[in-house]
Amino acid sequence: FDEKSDINILTCGCSHTVGVGVNQHEAWPFVLKELVKKHTEKTVSIHNLATSGASVDYVVRTVHKTIDILNPDFVCVFWPPVVRVEMPSNENDKAVTQSFLRDDNFPKNFVNKYWLQDYLFHKNLVLLQALTTANKSKFISNTVIESMVDDIDGDYFPADSTARDGLHPGPNWHKTGAEFYFKHINQHI
């Protein structure tokens, strides 16, 4: 984390940002780094703090813990699926664990089964926008969930499944993702 460049970029998300199924240099954060270097002729650092299986809470908590240390010019997030919710595993247990909310285990006191996950996503989105503004970082995000695109910058781009594992996006999708983030970064450099 000591690396400082002319342009410092923090990236975070889930396996889509880690680059599961593609070579590291093909993952969108590292394609983005090369695009920024090529078009600016400046030094660029990428701090990819993504982890496979991450929740929206993980993303915001990770940025919160590191933004003062890394001092990024840009925070680029590819939001994980919003069904990954961190919550107590039961009422008597103080440990918070990540759970996947499904129709059959959704809390009965919520009439609309999507209300809680949408609320938690928006709460985290607002917090991350405030964090990046307070730290003078430009915040850019996108998501695997098409319905959430109205709340973030840019257009939804569907994931192809051409990665080695057959489940995650392949190199072409990562290139498209890097170009999305570069388009927004390029407006500010």
Language model segments and positions:
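Serine-esterase "nucleophile elbow" of acetyl-processing enzymes
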Residues: 1-52, 57
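Alpha-helical cap/lid subdomain in secreted, periplasmic
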Residues: 60-189
